[in-house]
């Protein structure tokens, strides 16, 4: 066996190595660049006269601070709505009771049929209410988990970080995009990792594929809004489609990150997104901002409708980023938060090329 092993060994071979003198000689023969100087005085262009700084400032002004859910507090409007809701429910109940009694007075089978219909309606209504309550609780659980992860990273307690990351793994267990990340985290259960690094590892392994999918969802919605705005004949059609696409995008974002909102949950998310945009003053885009963004060769080539399509697409992207902040179960730490500049090149390629040539 040892003889066979010796036969399989690589036979000795010879190869030439360049001498150090030859290498040094080759380096000496390489021509060196002679020192040079500027013939004219270098003049620094101030920011006020820079023709390209306007575009950068315009794009940066489109970026939003991270969206946070609004604080829920009891207001007089909610008290009034609850009181009138109870009153309307009692009125509906009395009307149904009177209707069933009248049907019984006419014929027993009509009365029993009405009772059966009312029972089916009540059961269906309770199921709908249960689903809505579960959806609202799921959204609240996501925000609670987000706060717990941030607190665990700030405190540095490994046990709290382990418990919070385990809850995150359980939340995303049904998403096949996180299978590889969950397996990777399972391998580190016995390792000694401090809390900030454990949370950053969890973010990279679990949320990186979800963030890529979220960016794809936002970009797809923004492109569809841009196309519809460019070809639609009426502004009302634009507004209706933007609302429809935004609601669809927000629901997809919530489902991607583990939330399953019902109708009330979706309305709550949309209200939080709109409130965030309103507070930051980011709902409307002025004509000067449009000219700054589309001014480098693109506005002169595109029609006004196409320019409006690009702007509406950017507004949709801002709504998507705000929805991503609200639905994501972790704050951005190890991964970069998306910005409007990430979508500007896809929505307006000419602008990206102009900025690249300017740089």
Swiss-Prot record:
Where, by residue number, does the polypeptide cross the bilayer?
A: 76-96, 109-129
Q: What compartments host this protein?
A: Cell inner membrane
> Which cellular components does GO assign to this protein?
plasma membrane
- On whether Protein biosynthesis is a keyword of this UniProt record, the answer is no
How this chain sits in the membrane, per its record, is: Multi-pass membrane protein
Q: Identify the keywords attached in UniProt to this record, alphabetized.
A: Cell inner membrane, Cell membrane, Membrane, Transmembrane, Transmembrane helix
Top-level taxonomic group: Bacteria
Concerning NCBIfam families, the annotation shows: hyp_HI0043 (TIGR01620)
Q: Which PANTHER family does the annotation name?
A: UPF0283 MEMBRANE PROTEIN YCJF (PTHR39342:SF1)
Name the family: Belongs to the UPF0283 family.
Q: Tell me what this protein is called.
A: UPF0283 membrane protein R01807
What is the species of this protein?
Rhizobium meliloti (strain 1021) (Ensifer meliloti)
């Amino acid at each position: 066996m040892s003889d066979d092993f010796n036969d399989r060994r690589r036979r000795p071979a010879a190869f030439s190595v360049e001498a150090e003198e030859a290498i040094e000689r080759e380096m000496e023969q390489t021509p060196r660049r002679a020192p040079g100087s500027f013939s004219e005085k270098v003049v620094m262009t101030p920011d006020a006269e820079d023709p390209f700084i306007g575009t950068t400032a315009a794009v940066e002004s489109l970026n939003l601070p991270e969206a946070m859910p609004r604080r829920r507090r009891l207001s007089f409007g909610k008290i009034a709505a609850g009181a009138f809701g109870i009153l309307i429910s009692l009125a509906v109940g009395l009307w149904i009771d009177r209707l069933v009694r009248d049907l019984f007075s006419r014929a027993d089978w009509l009365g029993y049929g009405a009772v059966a219909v009312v029972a089916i309606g009540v059961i269906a209504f309770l199921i709908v209410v249960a689903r809505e309550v579960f959806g609202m609780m799921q959204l609240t659980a996501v925000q609670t988990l987000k706060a717990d992860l941030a607190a665990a990273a700030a405190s540095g307690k490994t046990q709290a970080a382990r418990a919070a990351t385990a809850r995150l793994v359980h939340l995303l267990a049904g998403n096949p995009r996180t299978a590889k990340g969950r397996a990777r985290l399972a391998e580190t259960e016995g390792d000694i990792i401090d809390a900030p690094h454990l949370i950053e590892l969890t973010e990279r392994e679990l949320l990186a594929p979800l963030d890529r999918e979220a960016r794809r969802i936002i970009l797809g919605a923004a492109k569809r809004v841009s196309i519809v705005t460019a070809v639609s004949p009426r502004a009302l059609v634009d507004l209706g489609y933007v609302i429809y696409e935004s609601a669809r995008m927000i629901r997809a974002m919530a489902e991607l990150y583990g939330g399953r909102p019902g109708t009330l949950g979706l309305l709550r998310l949309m209200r939080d997104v709109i409130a965030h945009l309103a507070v930051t003053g980011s709902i409307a885009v002025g004509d000067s901002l449009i000219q700054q963004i589309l001014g480098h060769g693109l506005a002169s080539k595109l029609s006004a409708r196409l320019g409006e399509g690009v702007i509406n697409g950017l507004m949709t992207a801002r709504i998507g980023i705000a929805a991503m902040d609200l639905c994501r179960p972790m704050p951005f730490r190890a991964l970069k938060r998306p910005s409007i500049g990430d979508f500007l090149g896809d929505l307006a390629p000419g602008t990206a090329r102009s900025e690249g040539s300017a740089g």
